């Protein structure tokens, strides 16, 4: 399986890397990082002064193999972690161009807000209302979507195993 290479990650951080973009779950393989792996990333990032931007946009599609841990729920993650989330993938709201950038550290949040203002990035009120409605009232929809995707995945895996045994999945 796909594993995080912590030795290489630390070497990169030591070399002066200032920002890490992490997908959780990983896209495209769908791997949900363990709480322990994420905690280790946070600890290394704090040690070397690296900001971790954790893209959690696919978190709603967790197939249940491992419980999703949100990066900001981890000890000391609030110091240098940014969490990105959105209902655009889960609820097909991409046209509303809505997402959330959650930053617990007030100093870092201020820097990001300043850069967003310079770039004329402003909240989208229609998107914000739609995203809120999706997360407050969309559980039944999301459950059905996840089940549909799971069935498609299972069908594809069975087909490949039966008809294309040269491909290992």
Question: Which role does the model predict for each range below?
Answer:
Residues 4, 8, 12, 16, ...:
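Alpha-helical elements of Rossmann-like donor-binding domains used by nucleotide-donor carbohydrate transfer enzymes
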Residues 36-43, 107, 155-158:
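Alpha-helical scaffolding segments of alpha/beta enzyme cores, especially the outer helices
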Residues 149-150, 163-169:
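Conserved PLP-binding catalytic core of the aspartate aminotransferase-like
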Residues 74, 79-150, 159:
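Conserved core segment of the aminotransferase class I/II
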Residues 2-65:
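Active-site phosphate-binding strand-loop segment of PLP-dependent enzymes
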Residues 49, 150-153, 157:
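Structural signal for well-ordered, non-membrane alpha-helices
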Residues 48, 77-80, 164-165:
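A short helix-to-beta-strand connector/capping loop
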